[in-house]
Amino acid sequence: MMSRNRRMRDLDSNPCLEETDASTKCMDDNRYEKDLCTPYFVKYKNCRKFWNGIMVTRRREGTVPYMPTAEERKHILESMKSLPY
């Protein structure tokens, strides 16, 4: 079993890794002034909300794993033509 920190850095476990890194970098670059990083936080929050909805739907349908793998997520996003968040 992976530790929580390692799981959060794993692309298969964390669908919003890119958004996580962007918001962290913004905070580092702006000396932790949250107001300057609000757009990054909103994008991260919307990303989590979107993939949580996908996960709930898959769980309801009995699809395993509940969270799509990184490869599956790539295909889902490509089929949408633009990022939903």
From Swiss-Prot:
Superkingdom of the organism of origin: Eukaryota
Disulfide bonds: 16-47, 26-37
Short motif (Cx9C motif 1): ranges: 16-26
GO cellular component: mitochondrial intermembrane space
Renumbered ranges of motif Cx9C motif 2: 37-47
Subcellular location: Mitochondrion intermembrane space
Mitochondrion in keyword set: yes
Keywords: Disulfide bond, Mitochondrion
Major subcellular location class: mitochondrion
InterPro entries membership: CHCH, COX23, Cys_alpha_HP_mot_SF
Keyword match Chloroplast: no
CHCH domain ranges (all copies): 13-55
Family, as annotated: Belongs to the CHCHD7 family.
The protein's name in its UniProt record: Coiled-coil-helix-coiled-coil-helix domain-containing protein 7
Source organism (scientific name): Xenopus tropicalis (Western clawed frog)
